[in-house]
Amino acid sequence: TTQAQLFSLTDFLQLDDVITKVECFDISHTTGDKCIAACVALSQDGFDKNQYRRFNISGITPGDDYAAIGQAVRRHYSRAVEEGKKLPDVVVIDGGKGQLRIAKECMNKLGLSNIPVIGIAKGLGRKSGEEKIFLNLQKQPLAKEQHSPAIYLLQVVRDEAHRFAITGHRAKKRKTLLKSDLESIEGIGPAKKKN
């Protein structure tokens, strides 16, 4: 069950309080174009799709995943703090030490230094199970058991964030392509394009 996996993750991270909510971020773009960040939420009852969020990333150098993750984390948690929303017990970043460092710095600046941040770095050949897991700003990855419920949970949350980011990116790309196709047709005005 998800609850058992959250207990396992609590033990794996050696936290005092049992984890009840995890949020995970991922970035999707095509060579820096139409960059989307996604955040998914998981609680004891499973994924909470009402808390999923996507962010259109702008004002950064195309392809700069560090700036993109920073913008998404900053926007998401500054709003959550402002609105008094329940914060996660753990934040997961689909990325290595660089993305993790940026996310942790953003959390610290927002006064959320007490929330652990995990980075999942892709392993050799990007194969599932070969990723390295980093906690906060530790230099060495955490030692992990290959088939533990905690690792499985992190992989599932990461994969869901990845899926949500990619579907958002593809929708944005499709919308742009459709819009440019309509603009090239003579005789179609602004009112027709909207419909």
Summary of predicted features, one role per range:
Residues T1-N195:
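Acidic, glycine-enriched active-site microenvironments
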